[in-house]
Design a protein with these regions (language model features):
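Hydrophobic transmembrane alpha-helices and their immediate loop junctions
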Residues: 1-213
């Protein structure tokens, strides 16, 4: 597990804890921060399931996974060999977001059931937040640029159309760098408007994208 996971864990836990601290009706004291830490751990479990889904599809395609490394905004599965066809690339890439959207649906159902049963806000609030974060992670990962899953989907489609893997890879990498620049610009905007937490988030995402594109 890459050391950068500590950064995202602290940011996730603090962000949600701060949100709960300001939420009307939520218990005070240590409750917001403890709940934030627990929710952060569940969030990381969701990221791990996202990556395991890639690994599962890879193994079904006859490709072994040496290890999975969690990074600041997801993870990277280290494969024993390169993908052999656009079809396998597409299936492996789309598996992660699909699982993430399924998790969002599960948390959404739990949120509705718990809320209608008048369960404590200590339990209900994290469910709602996990719906939002999984939808965000799923949607973000579908952006068409490396190293995101959407970039691999784009590469698979270009690879199939042109028959040139190197050309398809280059196009997906450039797209990833362009996306990183726009995300970084959004981060600067948030800093200028004194929304520092969002600014940090977006700048970290931009750096992550650009370095790995």
């Amino acid at each position: 597990m890459n050391a950068s996971w500590l950064i995202i864990f602290v940011l996730v836990s603090y962000s949600f804890g701060a949100l709960l601290y300001e939420t009307r009706g939520f218990p005070g004291g240590a409750w917001p921060w403890v709940t934030g830490v627990i929710t952060g751990a569940i969030f990381f479990a969701c990221l791990l399931l996202h990556e395991l889904s890639h690994s599962y599809v890879a193994k079904r395609s006859g490709i072994s996974i040496n290890r999975i490394t969690l990074f600041i905004f997801g993870g990277v599965a280290e494969m024993s060999e390169d993908v052999q066809s656009p079809r396998d690339e597409f299936r492996m890439a789309i598996a992660g977001p699909l699982v993430t959207f399924i998790l969002a649906g599960i948390f959404g159902l739990l949120y509705l059931l718990l809320r209608s049963s008048n369960v404590s806000i200590v339990v209900v609030a994290p469910m709602g937040w996990l719906v939002f974060t999984n939808l965000m992670i799923g949607g973000f990962n579908l952006l068409p640029g490396f190293p995101l899953d959407g970039g691999r989907v784009l590469r698979s489609l270009l690879w199939k159309k042109t028959g040139d893997l190197r050309r398809a890879t280059r196009a997906a990498s450039i797209s990833g760098q362009v996306i990183a620049v726009f995300v970084g610009g959004a981060g600067v905007y948030f800093f200028l408007t004194r929304n520092y937490v969002s600014g940090v988030w977006f700048l970290l995402i931009a750096i992550f994208l650009y370095q790995l594109a």
